[in-house]
Amino acid sequence: MDYQLVPMDKSHLKEVAELDKALFTRPWSADSWESELYNDTVSLVVAEDPDGGVLGYGVLGVILDEGCLEKIAVRPDCRRKGVAQAILGSFLRYGEEHLAYIGLEVREDNSPALALYEKNGFTAVGRRKNYYAEVHKDAILMDKVFREVTP
């Protein structure tokens, strides 16, 4: 599959918002996506095909030396082709260089995402009961530590 990772810009917003709405039970609004473009504490990455189409995207929030993986999403027809791994890999490379850790929440029944995160060194550190109340599912909290945080 031919694609490249690029920083998200305004040209991606419509496709990203549509994909987000199709894939998530709590999608972000178009306005939220646009405001994230101008948020200095967020890294937005798009996997873009040669024609500029969005195959997937990722969002990493950063405060000081802490990262929060907010979203990784890939079009259903582009899954199992390394797109999510490439997006996550870009965030992990940034994390190794600049962060103490990256944390995330993932729905307990999202087996592909759980496998991806575990394969990349994330470990389960907790659970939020009924976090996804609309589908009665828990969130699994996971972290990948790059260096110990000292108070």
Show the residue positions of the predicted features.
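Acetyl-CoA-dependent GNAT
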Residues: 7-77, 88-95, 145-149
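Short hydrophobic/aromatic beta-strand or adjacent loop that forms the aromatic wall/cage
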Residues: 42, 137-141
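Residue-level recognition of the GNAT/N-acetyltransferase active site
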Residues: 75, 79, 107-109, 134
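Short glycine/proline-centered loop/turn elements that form peptide/ligand docking sites
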Residues: 84, 88, 109-113, 130-135
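Conserved GNAT acetyl-CoA-binding A-motif
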Residues: 95-105
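Conserved catalytic-core motifs of GNAT/GCN5-like acyltransferases
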Residues: 103-105, 123-138
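Conserved active-site tyrosine of GNAT-family acetyltransferases
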Residues: 117-118, 122, 142
